[in-house]
């Protein structure tokens, strides 16, 4: 970070690689006050609660599940009729072999819904928070559902006291979007996996690695599930009106916990925390931004200072993934950036005043100068002044840059 004579300390902050507000790699306060209007909360009949922020309208049933998630800007209802978003499900988990590793396809077809109740509704810094308690015998789940002012994102935080045997816990996130594929995050790229299973190969992908997010979209609209702390999920069509012969949406379920009995009969028993979010009107940029914030750790007593380097996307989506000192001990700054959406992109490199006059050149991934001749380069003109250097990226291209004073 850039050195100053004096910098304010932020009590709690996050530093994320990519943000939609242009504050990537800056320390951003937790629960920072906003000028947007506070979220409206209203108690409805039968113990239901309505949350509205002018962008989203959320109806939470008395059992803590969500019966309506309405994108008011687009008039799009995202919870299919007859389903509930945020419902916990217990599945049988008794694989024939590798008890703590395998997931049987058939186990995903038999789920028992857990029941819960709303405990409290409160507001803080304009955000509305609904606290839900869900229990099954000795297992207790406390969920905080949060809607923030002006946000396209509905956030979930779960504290789970897990005491099950041979059970598998998922949370159901049905979306009123009909799609045959979902787009998943992977390192330095995206990967598409089937929702509609047409072949034996498709059927074998009944559980998928989720990384930080999955985007489900049709030709005109998409939503994303942002994943903060779990790695597996399954996606399948939701059957609609049989007479009309069409589906009504996509069932997306995050895998939270299992309870194998071998080799350790107490595997995962105890307390766990999980975070996930649902982003409406999702784009790759919006999903990346939400994923960056959700996955960034909360830091304490963080100096409010300028990052040593930053990248301004001129067009397309370029992410500055990390920065570090060079391995050779020279004191040079190494920066890794990549194109994240699968298209062409142009960007401009910026450095903080402490590095004024520094030069930049592109290296290979091992920080060496011998670039491969059969790979594209992002820095077209070789070594040059670091401030304002122009970068060009192809789809999912990554670049390693060395900044030298």
Predicted regions and their residues:
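C-terminal (or distal) subdomains of carbohydrate-active enzymes
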Residues: 4-405
